[in-house]
Amino acid sequence: MPLKLIDLFCGAGGFSRGFKDEGFDVVLGVDNMPQVAESFKANFLEAQVLVEDIQQLRSEDVVDPLVGDVDVVIGSPPCEPFTGANPRRRPNPLDRLYDDPQGRLVLHFIRLVGDLKPKVFVMENVPALAEGPLREALKREFARVGYPNVYFNLLRAEDYGTPSHRLRLFISNARIKPPASGRKVTVIEAIGDLPPPSSPHDIPNHELIPLSPRKQKRISKLRWGEALIRYAGAEGKIYHNYVRLHPYRLAPTVMGSSRFVHPFEDRLLTVREQARLMGFPDNHVFRGGRDLQFDQVGEAVPPPLARAIAREVKRWLFKSGFG
């Protein structure tokens, strides 16, 4: 019998995609945005989908009426309170968890894990979620709901076949250290076989993005690796956007706000090309307006990394006698 999985903060389902591809039964996704939930439903037709604020969600709303007992709970609470890319991040790390309204969503994830009592949970976020006193605070919170042994697993998506850099933290009651897959996948290997978006095709989310003549002229002058926009994140760190991608290297980290310039053409990448940089298959679709589609791509767990994690979770469950 397949292992049952619930995805909290499911987004478009990148995290769930990896588990589904590894044979898990994705029974429920929860997201508070209706159009994002539509994306999830379009990709997981047999799953239930709840459009719900997780702060209002109780385990009894989920377990008996919808899915029964669950084996695995995964989720990606918003990273904005913790990421260094947010210039308005609170200076005190504990304030990010306990006082920031979005940061407190992590605590609601922990609450639901305690109520649902899965055999394994995996929570994804930026590495800064565990910096300073936050690591010990999170250990205490998980211990309080019945999980005294918690592992802070740092993984790089590019080690598992994702064509872009991405260092992320996966907090779990299982140790997750999948072996790296080997050779890295470059930008041109990821997107080079796609037809021009202006040509006839039937590839979803692969539409040309209009640019003003002024912006078109400016990006035409960019060389590989150069950026049109620079901005300051938390503590003055500089970030770049509208980067012309180097075709023979990995792409930079894909964020919801990221827009990339094609290596050889004076245009922005389409949503589909950006999804390719995250390892999404072309049959994984994104609903809503274009900016929301980009958000869904950039906020996802890359499916190749998710599948490597799913493989480790399955191994841990069998080793622990649950499989």
Indicate residue ranges for each PLM-predicted region.
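C-terminal target-recognition/interaction regions appended to catalytic cores
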Residues: 206-323
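Class I SAM-dependent methyltransferase "Motif I" SAM/SAH-binding loop
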Residues: 9-10
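Conserved SAM/SAH-binding loop
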Residues: 52-57, 155
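Short, conserved SAM-binding/catalytic segment
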Residues: 40-49
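Class I S-adenosyl-L-methionine
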Residues: 60-70, 80-241
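Conserved SAM/SAH-binding beta-strand->alpha-helix loop
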Residues: 33
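Short beta-strand element of Class I
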Residues: 26-27
